[in-house]
């Protein structure tokens, strides 16, 4: 069993190190890693990209296992073997393990994104001799802006939740008022049927039962009147304004000057443009390599065709030689017979 696992792992390691695996996997990572950030929050786009990566890896592995003759059970047993969990092999098999482990996949994509950004910055520095001003300032203002916006959103959600709870209390109080009214009406009808002469007692009991309900309903009625006067957009603006006042945070976008905003935009556009140039150069180099391989294949095919033609000509020469031999032998026999 151990020897089978070692053989399967050796085959998979050789395949993972080859160009059939590395070229499509690296190309996928370079094109899809730009949206991955080193944050705790997982975006919805991460899941879609992970599913696409699963399909790619499963297709490549299935083709290799079918060519080598390894079954799916043997591959699973080899992955579960202790040898596959060693530190060295685990690092090499990281792209394969990322299919089932989303944390490994995210860390791998974040690392590739950082590598491409550093590569783009290095190329900029080599061309210009120095980095531009938009890439030299220290603190990242964008992350601070995102944190402040998240605080505002969470505060607005908290206020909307409180408003929703107040609305629910108002509705429950209204329902209780209706039930008490119906209950008092039934009591009045029952009392009038039993004692028609005594008509003052049900009215007094009805007033006594309605008094505490009216006291509870008054604050909710005021709140509901305010809610009716305000539209949905005004209510949302009021919640955000209240959140800013309570948290002591003003809008982060308004805190920035026009020069800082333009500098942030220049920085993002500059990096994006350099990144696209780098990817375009890589694509051109891959196309050139592919074209050279196609030319080599055509050359080898032409050589094979030439060798086949030579074989045919040799075969014809042999047939002619055989015919000449037969004619010579027949001539000699006829001469001896005469």
Swiss-Prot record:
Database matches in Pfam families: ARL2_Bind_BART
Any coiled-coil regions, as ranges: 142-179, 255-330
Domain of life according to the entry: Eukaryota
Disulphide linkage map: none
Gene Ontology CC: axoneme; ciliary base; motile cilium; nucleus
Comp. bias intervals (Polar residues): 187-202
Main location: nucleus
Residue ranges, annotated region (Disordered): 175-220, 281-314
Record flagged with keyword Metal-binding: no
This protein's UniProt keywords: Cell projection, Cilium, Coiled coil, Cytoplasm, Flagellum, Nucleus
Keyword NAD belongs to the record: no
Compartment list: Nucleus; Cytoplasm; Cell projection, Cilium, Flagellum
Similarity-based family: Belongs to the CFAP36 family.
The name this protein goes by in its record: Cilia- and flagella-associated protein 36
Organism whose genome encodes this protein: Xenopus laevis (African clawed frog)
Species lineage: Eukaryota, Metazoa, Chordata, Craniata, Vertebrata
């Amino acid at each position: 069993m151990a020897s089978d696992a070692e053989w399967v792992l050796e085959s998979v390691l050789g395949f993972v190190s080859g160009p059939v695996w590395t070229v499509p996997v690296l190309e996928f990572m370079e094109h899809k890693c730009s949206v991955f950030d080193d944050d705790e929050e997982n975006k919805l786009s991460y899941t879609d990209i992970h599913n696409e990566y699963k399909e790619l890896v499963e297709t490549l592995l299935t083709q290799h296992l079918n060519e080598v003759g390894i079954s799916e059970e043997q591959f699973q047993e080899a992955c579960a073997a202790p040898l596959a969990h060693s530190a060295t092999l685990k690092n090499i098999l990281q792209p394969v393990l990322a299919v089932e482990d989303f944390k490994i996949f995210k860390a791998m994509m974040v690392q590739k994104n950082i590598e491409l950004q550093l590569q783009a910055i290095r190329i900029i520095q080599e061309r210009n001799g120095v980095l531009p001003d938009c890439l030299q300032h220290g603190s990242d203002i964008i992350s601070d802006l995102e944190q402040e916006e998240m605080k505002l959103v969470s505060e607005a959600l908290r206020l909307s939740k409180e408003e929703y709870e107040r609305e629910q209390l108002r509705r429950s109080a209204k329902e209780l008022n209706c039930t008490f009214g119906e209950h008092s009406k039934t009591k009045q009808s029952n009392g009038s049927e039993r004692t028609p002469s005594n008509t003052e007692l049900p009215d007094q009991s009805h007033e006594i039962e309605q008094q505490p309900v009216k006291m509870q309903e008054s604050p909710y009625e005021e709140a509901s009147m305010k809610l009716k006067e305000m539209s949905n957009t005004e209510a949302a603006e009021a919640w955000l304004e209240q959140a800013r006042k309570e948290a002591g945070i003003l809008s982060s976008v308004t805190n920035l000057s026009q020069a800082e905003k333009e500098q942030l935009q220049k920085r993002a556009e500059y990096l994006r443009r350099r990144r696209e140039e780098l990817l375009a150069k890589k694509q051109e180099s891959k196309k050139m390599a592919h074209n050279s391989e196609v030319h080599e294949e055509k050359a080898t095919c032409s050589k094979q065709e030439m060798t086949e033609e030579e074989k045919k000509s040799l075969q014809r020469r042999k047939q002619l030689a055989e015919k000449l031999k037969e004619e010579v032998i027949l001539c000699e026999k006829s001469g001896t017979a005469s």
